[in-house]
Amino acid sequence: MAETDAAAAQQPPQIQMRVLGQFIRDMSFENVMAQRGASGDVQPDVNVQVNLDAKKRSTDNQYEIAIKLNITSKAKGMDDVLFVFEIDYCGIFHVEGVPNEQLHPFLLIECPRMLFPFLRRIVSDITRDGGYPPLNLDNIDFMALYRSELARQQAAAQAEQKADA
């Protein structure tokens, strides 16, 4: 009996994650080409910028995760903007069993990974409804994005320390 209690105490806690809700916090689709009265077949050159944010909510073990996309589409080879699409898509998650030192990466990697398919569909539908071919976003490597942001923050902190010295 004591052996089973000791074995249970040594096992890491079971990670539990539930999506409690997801929603569009803010969205803007500016159809610049249509406002100018222009039409026709143009090859788009699409630029997608991704930002992530995580906030603890007042309820225990609940977090709000936001994926913020800023998408600009220009006519290929020109500076003419076709459309600008900004969306702030959020999910409310209940997370348990994640050690504190792993919580931040978990929230900014695993939670956005769960939300992304829904966000991709919204982007596709809105661009199609805006009169363009549906924009089917490629998968985002949230782990690489997290590591890149962490490296950028560390480099900025080092540069700040050198400037203060």
UniProtKB/Swiss-Prot annotation:
Alphabetic keyword roster: Chaperone, Cytoplasm, Protein transport, Translocation, Transport
Origin superkingdom: Bacteria
Single GO term (MF): unfolded protein binding
Xref: Pfam families: SecB
Subcellular location as annotated: Cytoplasm
Assigned GO CC terms: cytoplasm
HAMAP family attached to this UniProt entry: SecB
Entry similarity comment: Belongs to the SecB family.
Quaternary structure note: Homotetramer, a dimer of dimers. One homotetramer interacts with 1 SecA dimer.
Name of this protein: Protein-export protein SecB
Species, as recorded: Ruegeria pomeroyi (strain ATCC 700808 / DSM 15171 / DSS-3)
